[in-house]
C-alpha cells in the first residue's frame, strides 16, 4: 500500500516539478557500467553484456528526475574520451569491479588522472564498487582505502558497494543521483 502511495505521489509531483541531470559513467572495462545503466533503467540484469565501443547515451526517468547517462567505454583506447564527456555534467559515476583486485590499482590511477583535469574541478563523484556479490570483493571501507579517495579534496566524493546482479544498494545510488540533479554544472 505504501509503495502505491509513493508511486502516486511521485506521479503527481512529476506533473508540476521536473528535474533533469546529466552524468557520465566511466571506469575500466568489465566493471559493469552498461549493466548498471540497464538495471536502473529497466530493473533487468543480464550476464550477456557486450563491451561498450565508444559510448552510449540513455535517458532514464525516476520519479520527477530525468537522468541523461553517458556510458563511456572502459578499454584503454576509449579512456582519452572520458574527460570530454565528463565536462559540464552534474556528476561523474566511476565504476570499479570490486572483485577484481588485480585491476584496482589501475582503476585508482585512471580515476585520479581523470579528476586532475582542471575542467572537471568541483564536479561531484560517486564511486561504485560493483560485484559485491562475488567472493573476495572489496567492501566500501577497503575500496575507499585502495582507491585513495581520502586524497580527493576539491569536490564531494561518495562511495557505495553495489551488486547490479543482486540489485544491492541500487536504491541508495539512485537517491544520491537524484539528490545531485540540482548540482550546478561546471
Curated annotation (Swiss-Prot):
<keyword id="KW-0498">Mitosis</keyword>
<dbReference type="InterPro" id="IPR027417">
    <property type="entry name" value="P-loop_NTPase"/>
</dbReference>
<dbReference type="GO" id="GO:0051301">
    <property type="term" value="P:cell division"/>
</dbReference>
<dbReference type="GO" id="GO:0008089">
    <property type="term" value="P:anterograde axonal transport"/>
</dbReference>
<keyword id="KW-0472">Membrane</keyword>
<feature type="binding site">
    <location>
        <begin position="130"/>
        <end position="133"/>
    </location>
    <ligand>
        <name>GTP</name>
    </ligand>
</feature>
<keyword id="KW-0132">Cell division</keyword>
<dbReference type="GO" id="GO:0005819">
    <property type="term" value="C:spindle"/>
</dbReference>
<feature type="binding site">
    <location>
        <begin position="29"/>
        <end position="35"/>
    </location>
    <ligand>
        <name>GTP</name>
    </ligand>
</feature>
<keyword id="KW-0547">Nucleotide-binding</keyword>
<dbReference type="InterPro" id="IPR044154">
    <property type="entry name" value="Arl8a/8b"/>
</dbReference>
<dbReference type="Pfam" id="PF00025">
    <property type="entry name" value="Arf"/>
</dbReference>
<keyword id="KW-0342">GTP-binding</keyword>
<dbReference type="GO" id="GO:0005764">
    <property type="term" value="C:lysosome"/>
</dbReference>
<dbReference type="GO" id="GO:0007059">
    <property type="term" value="P:chromosome segregation"/>
</dbReference>
<feature type="intramembrane region" description="Note=Mediates targeting to membranes">
    <location>
        <begin position="1"/>
        <end position="19"/>
    </location>
</feature>
<dbReference type="GO" id="GO:1904115">
    <property type="term" value="C:axon cytoplasm"/>
</dbReference>
<keyword id="KW-0963">Cytoplasm</keyword>
<dbReference type="GO" id="GO:1902774">
    <property type="term" value="P:late endosome to lysosome transport"/>
</dbReference>
<feature type="binding site">
    <location>
        <begin position="71"/>
        <end position="75"/>
    </location>
    <ligand>
        <name>GTP</name>
    </ligand>
</feature>
<dbReference type="GO" id="GO:0005525">
    <property type="term" value="F:GTP binding"/>
</dbReference>
<keyword id="KW-0206">Cytoskeleton</keyword>
<keyword id="KW-0967">Endosome</keyword>
<dbReference type="GO" id="GO:0031901">
    <property type="term" value="C:early endosome membrane"/>
</dbReference>
<dbReference type="GO" id="GO:0015031">
    <property type="term" value="P:protein transport"/>
</dbReference>
<dbReference type="InterPro" id="IPR005225">
    <property type="entry name" value="Small_GTP-bd"/>
</dbReference>
<keyword id="KW-0131">Cell cycle</keyword>
<dbReference type="InterPro" id="IPR006689">
    <property type="entry name" value="Small_GTPase_ARF/SAR"/>
</dbReference>
<dbReference type="GO" id="GO:0061909">
    <property type="term" value="P:autophagosome-lysosome fusion"/>
</dbReference>
<dbReference type="GO" id="GO:0031902">
    <property type="term" value="C:late endosome membrane"/>
</dbReference>
<dbReference type="GO" id="GO:0005765">
    <property type="term" value="C:lysosomal membrane"/>
</dbReference>
<comment type="function">
    <text>Small GTPase which cycles between active GTP-bound and inactive GDP-bound states. In its active state, binds to a variety of effector proteins playing a key role in the regulation of lysosomal positioning which is important for nutrient sensing, natural killer cell-mediated cytotoxicity and antigen presentation. Along with its effectors, orchestrates lysosomal transport and fusion.</text>
</comment>
<dbReference type="GO" id="GO:0003924">
    <property type="term" value="F:GTPase activity"/>
</dbReference>
<keyword id="KW-0159">Chromosome partition</keyword>
<protein>
    <recommendedName>
        <fullName>ADP-ribosylation factor-like protein 8B-A</fullName>
    </recommendedName>
</protein>
<keyword id="KW-0458">Lysosome</keyword>
<dbReference type="GO" id="GO:0032418">
    <property type="term" value="P:lysosome localization"/>
</dbReference>
<comment type="similarity">
    <text>Belongs to the small GTPase superfamily. Arf family.</text>
</comment>
